[in-house]
Amino acid sequence: MAVSEIKAKFKLNPLTKVPNFHSRRDKDLPGLLPCQLQHKERKLSPSQMRAFQDAYNFFNKDKTGCIDLHGMMCTLAKLGMNLTKHDVHNELRCADIDQDGKVNFSDFLKVLTDKNRFLKAVVPEKGTCLDLAGNPGILLFEILSKLIETSALPKKAISEIVSYFRRKFQETTSGMVWSPDTTGYGKRRFKPDICTPPSSSTAAFANAARIAIMKEKDLFKFLDELKKCNPPSDSPYSKIPIFPLFPNVDGVVMGKPFKDIQKLEMLKRKEPLNFFENYFFHKKDWKTQEANIKPVDPTSGYTTDILTIDQMLKRKQNWTVADAAAIKPHVKRATETYNLGIALEHRKQMLNLWRKIRGDLIGIESKNESFYDTFSTYTWSWNVCQELLSPKDLKLYDAHVNRNALHNSVFSSSSDISECDTDTGRKRKRKGFKGFRQ
């Protein structure tokens, strides 16, 4: 179908009635204060006008400088957005505010600055479809959000537009009372849609703006619901680090059998450096793991596990599901070996840092050994999902270094004494020889 035929078929006729987005929304906002309903829109500043003009210039337009069906379809294609011609035609009719059959810059500006259309885009009404086709009147907001997301506009224009809509969202929703007793929007704050991903990038931006102005109590509720909705993941970034914190064994420990506390105290008296971590957590023996790491091939620079996988991939050209399942354990083992090697190298670096800052003296000078726990916490590694150096490791390292230093100092002092005695003996001999000659 030619472009001229499309224009003739979907000619934008003047509207006899402007689509009303106000009546239903105002009825469905029981918590909105009267002062908010009577809120007068602020005039756009010159910099904001230029920012919206930059956004309008991105659209393909006809010879008169207005957005038509063909220009809107081309703009959507540039942004990778798919919409039928019928839906685009309806969106253009909704955007024709002055009913002149065209969407000019004035219409464009009135749509994007309208409070009710903005709410319809960022907070879809209950019972409406979440896609563009089932929720007409928000296409310009979605395109504007896409322009910001892809950085298709100048940096200054993006900053002005984002600041404008952030303030608009705060002003519009500041008077909403989100009580659970109200109907409609009052029930929407967390529970119904918390597990539903945002229907669009504009809604995602609105959610981010809403989180930024939440009170602490509401934020904790939001995070609790979010945790319930997220399925468990094998990613190391989804795991909570186990910090080396000591329990308060002097007070009452709820939910712990008394015999466990007695066992804990017994282990504490028996092995003061080894009781807590080995009792509560299955810590990895770094020396054993370091000995089990396979050496890197000097020619290729890779371990034998990775080279084995490489050979398996080269031998087979057509892979089946069974072949992929067979190679999966090899890949897992090679990945674990690689992560372990990285962790061990980082562990050596952290030990060198501890030696340079003289961490053992910090606890002695401050008369507090908590610095061992603090330093251990900051050696956490996601490669092995635990801290690379426990307080016990640091104390054993200090004992080893101090023992060697003491041995060296004793050896050096004894050698200095012998040298001093030798020099004294030589001086006495020379003095006696001079006296004999006299």
Curated annotation (Swiss-Prot):
Keyword field: Calcium, Metal-binding, Phosphoprotein, Repeat
Any GO MF annotation of the entry: calcium ion binding
Sites bearing Phosphotyrosine, chain numbering: Y279
Signal peptide: none
UniProt-listed Pfam families: EF-hand_8
Region feature (Disordered): 413-438
InterPro entries in alphabetical order: EF-hand-dom_pair, EF_Hand_1_Ca_BS, EF_hand_dom
Ranges annotated as biased composition (Basic residues): 426-438
Domain of life of the native organism: Eukaryota
Domain EF-hand residue range list: 47-82, 83-118
Residues involved in Ca(2+) binding: D96, D98, D100, K102, D107
PANTHER family listed in its UniProt record: EF-HAND CALCIUM-BINDING DOMAIN-CONTAINING PROTEIN 13
This protein's name: EF-hand calcium-binding domain-containing protein 3
